[in-house]
Amino acid sequence: MKRKLLIVNSNLHTGGVQKALAALLANIGNDYDVTLLLFYKGGACLGELPDNICVKEVNSAFRYLGMNRSDAKSPKDKLLRAIYAGITRVFGRKYAIALMGLGQKKLSGYAYAISYIQNGGDKAFYGGCNEFVAKHVGAGKKISFLHGDYRLCGANTALNAALYKSFDAIAACSQGCGDSILAALPELGDKLHIVKNCQRYDEIRARAEKTAVRLEPEKINIVTVARLGREKSVGRAVEAMARLGALQEKIHYYIIGDGIEKDRICGIIDEAKLGDTVTLCGSMDEPYGYIEAAELLLIPSLSEAAPMVIGEAACLATPVLSTETSSAREMIEDSGYGWVCENSVEGLRKGLEMLISEPDLLREKSKFLNTLHFDDSEAAGQFKAMLDRL
């Protein structure tokens, strides 16, 4: 008989955590009796789930933690979501969750219960899966996944620490993420497991072929795929390119994504007169054609955990240049996928200048990536080994 496994997540809107979850389910669905419980049953990644996964939605106010503003369509949902968000921002998430839990029946009968997305700060209207699994699920063993840098994402609070201590295991998606939480909570050392993200590489390659584009053949084409938020710091990449002088003529930079920083980035482009060098492409559900066509994937983030786009680029033979973040050296330099630079505008400038001045470095790295074999056997094996050890 297959062991019963409950995985709790907020929603399946497009994002790194959601893509990793869909890929994990594709790899483990035949080995366990899996129920995926979503706070809000919506999002583009719903269509990527295998048929053997039972997908349910909570029947309580926890659903508002899974909704974004556009999901709340009825007047009732808009009002209640606003009320819970307001309580969270004024008094803290624990008070909102206490109210949400009043109508939530306890679930039981599972060998393992997994909270797949971490919390943010105590007043961030985000997460809640840790609390749900800890307080509203009965299971033999409980596991919390960590997809962020614990010390830098706002999660390093007494409330979150107490929650993590209540779990039987913590699954960090990279060694860097694991090291970050252990630096704050060393007592969790015996509970920590490294479980890398699954990626479904064959699907990535197929989608790249389906969405193929032709970029400027006489240029070094550089692409960034990111939400345009402050932590992604895409504006710094544009500032670095403004400092390249005559080397600007050798490149074209494509920014795929949208967000609150878009207007500021447009201002930097205009001020630096980079309109012919930088193209804002907007959000794309399928950026893989651009990634494959580019000579370089650029990650200019102030902070990152283990971005899925690194593996996506590597399996498409596109080298990566990233600022130094918690997992960058582990995932990019140690793997041979590319280069890591100082986390600053000047560090980005130097890294770009080196690669633009010596394009053979990019060509040789791409050839190397083409020799590698990419599959999810290691990541799926780590997940299964963790469950077997508990």
Which residues fall in each region the model found?
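Conserved acidic donor-binding segment of nucleotide-sugar-dependent glycosyltransferases
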Residues: 334-345, 354-359
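Aromatic "clamp/platform" in nucleotide-sugar-dependent glycosyltransferases that forms part
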Residues: 283, 302
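A charged, aromatic-enriched C-terminal amphipathic alpha-helix characteristic of glycosyltransferases
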Residues: 360-390
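N-terminal strand-loop element at the rim of the active site
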Residues: 7-14, 27-94
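Acidic anion/phosphate-binding donor-loop and adjacent secondary structure
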Residues: 154-155, 179-183, 193-219, 289
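A conserved mid-protein helix/loop that constitutes part of the nucleotide-sugar donor-binding site
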Residues: 18-23, 220-243, 253, 260-266
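Short hydrophobic beta-strand element within catalytic cores of glycosyltransferases
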Residues: 319-322
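Nucleotide-activated donor-binding/catalytic signature segment of Leloir-type glycosyltransferases, i.e.
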Residues: 266-282
